């Protein structure tokens, strides 16, 4: 049995990481140890929705004063945050690899459809994407009919003015005409949702087995630029931003886990730690040898990300995506933290008498307040669980599940031990 020493991370990180990687079968029998202090426990930040993740990280970047890394499995995961950082003028370093997001089939197809919604006379564009939608007309027929398109005539006007179409074909053309007439009136987010859910593009993604994660990134970017015209222009600008790489010497770093190997940071935030993203595969008895090997590789990658942290490690997860329930579970979080995020002492006898503990110091309260950012879930002793919607100074606006929206003074609540961040607790069968 090999023993290796980790000189970088705290004991709480090393011990958890070592237990986590032991789940892999195809590895040398070795353990990691450290002589470093235990340090603070690993934190889980459970956001209410995926779309809150970029704004949460934006605030972290604004407050950043020491080496901090946002690490992710997929290169495209940084784009929503990169968009906000660039807009707000917040400095960052971006250890990018070549991104194929902007030229991927999903993104190219959806953006071309949006462009066509503003120029529905463009026959060439229409013939490039029509088969991806719920039109079900043959190319030969469409090409023949559109040969007679007049200069001032839309594609749909030409098709509906042709002779010899069957009633069902006319019905599909009219339905698509209605969809395209509506798209320019919608927000960019709603327009993308309409194309995917109601115009057949989602079926095309599934049938062609395209990378659906590109759609989530595109929706997140659309959510940050509501108007469709400016959204399409922003995509072009963001493509140029990704090539620049930010400021090389900035302490706030965005990086894939692969690119972070051999590096270390005072604080590490691992993002998108939800089943279906990281890990992208699930464990199970029916798992093929190929899937099992791929899952072990994802676990090794997660281990690398965890052990980039010298002192503070945070795992970002979320319960919903754009208001819809996401994947049920965060298996890597449970495995890393031993099924429960923070060990809780169970008392079985009478409570022992003890001297009253001193309350937190002003410095401790100030440090804790930095974690209470819009989008995080909190638990109040009196009001229960809620979502922190907004914050001005120490005044937080929180929407509680049971009692509605309230404004609270965070400093007072933290000093009295009345509020805390919602702990991650796994679902139990």
Q: Language-model segments: which ranges?
A:
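Long, highly charged, low-complexity intrinsically disordered interaction regions
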Residues: 71-130
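Conserved helicase C-terminal RecA-like lobe
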Residues: 113-326, 330-339
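Short, charged, surface-exposed secondary-structure boundary motifs
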Residues: 102-106, 408, 417-418
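C-terminal accessory regions
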Residues: 274-404, 416-429
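A short helix-turn-beta junction within AAA+ P-loop NTPase domains corresponding to the substrate/partner-engaging
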Residues: 1-3
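Helicase P-loop NTPase motor core
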Residues: 5-91, 118, 184, 366-369
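Helical mechanochemical/support elements of P-loop NTPase systems and associated helical scaffolds
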Residues: 6-12, 16-21, 50-53, 74-77, ...
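Conserved nucleotide-binding/hydrolysis micro-motifs of P-loop NTPases
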Residues: 6-10, 39, 75-78, 99-102, ...
């Amino acid at each position: 049995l090999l023993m290796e020493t980790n000189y970088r991370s705290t004991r709480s990180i090393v011990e958890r990481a070592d237990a986590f990687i032991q789940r892999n079968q195809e590895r040398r029998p070795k353990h990691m140890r450290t002589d470093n202090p235990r340090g603070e426990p690993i934190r889980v930040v459970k956001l209410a929705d995926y779309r809150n993740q970029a704004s949460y990280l934006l605030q972290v970047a604004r407050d950043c004063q020491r080496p901090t890394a946002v690490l992710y499995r997929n290169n495209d995961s940084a784009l929503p945050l990169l968009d906000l950082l660039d807009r707000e003028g917040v400095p960052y370093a971006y250890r990018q690899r070549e991104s194929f997001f902007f030229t991927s089939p999903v993104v190219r197809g959806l953006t071309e459809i949006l462009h066509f919604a503003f120029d529905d006379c463009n026959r060439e564009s229409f013939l490039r994407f029509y088969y991806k939608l719920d039109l079900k007309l043959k190319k030969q027929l469409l090409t023949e009919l559109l040969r007679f398109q007049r200069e001032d005539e839309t594609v749909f006007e030409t098709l509906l003015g042709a002779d010899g179409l069957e009633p069902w074909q006319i019905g599909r053309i009219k339905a698509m005409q209605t969809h395209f007439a509506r798209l320019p009136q919608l927000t960019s987010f709603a327009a993308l949702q309409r194309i995917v859910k109601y115009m057949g593009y989602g079926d095309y993604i599934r049938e062609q087995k395209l990378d659906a994660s590109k759609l989530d990134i595109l929706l997140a970017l659309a959510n940050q630029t509501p108007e469709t015209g400016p959204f399409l222009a922003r995509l072009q600008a963001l493509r140029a931003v990704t090539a620049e790489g930010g400021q090389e010497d900035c302490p706030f770093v965005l990086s894939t886990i692969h690119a972070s190997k051999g590096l270390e940071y005072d604080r590490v935030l691992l993002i998108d730690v939800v089943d279906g993203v990281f890990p992208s595969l699930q464990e199970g008895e029916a798992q093929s040898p190929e899937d099992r090997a791929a899952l072990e590789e994802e676990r090794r990658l997660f281990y690398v990300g965890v052990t980039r942290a010298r002192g503070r490690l945070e795992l970002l997860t979320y319960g919903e995506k754009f208001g819809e329930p996401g994947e049920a579970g965060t298996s890597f979080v449970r495995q890393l933290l031993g099924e429960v995020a923070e060990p809780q002492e169970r008392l079985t006898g009478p409570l022992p008498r003890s001297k009253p503990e001193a309350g937190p110091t002003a410095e401790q309260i100030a440090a804790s307040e930095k974690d209470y950012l819009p989008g995080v879930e909190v638990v109040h002793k009196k009001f229960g669980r809620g979502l922190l919607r907004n914050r001005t100074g120490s005044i937080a606006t929180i929407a509680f599940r049971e009692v509605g929206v309230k404004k609270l003074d965070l400093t007072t609540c933290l000093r009295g031990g009345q509020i805390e961040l919602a702990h991650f607790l796994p679902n139990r069968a």
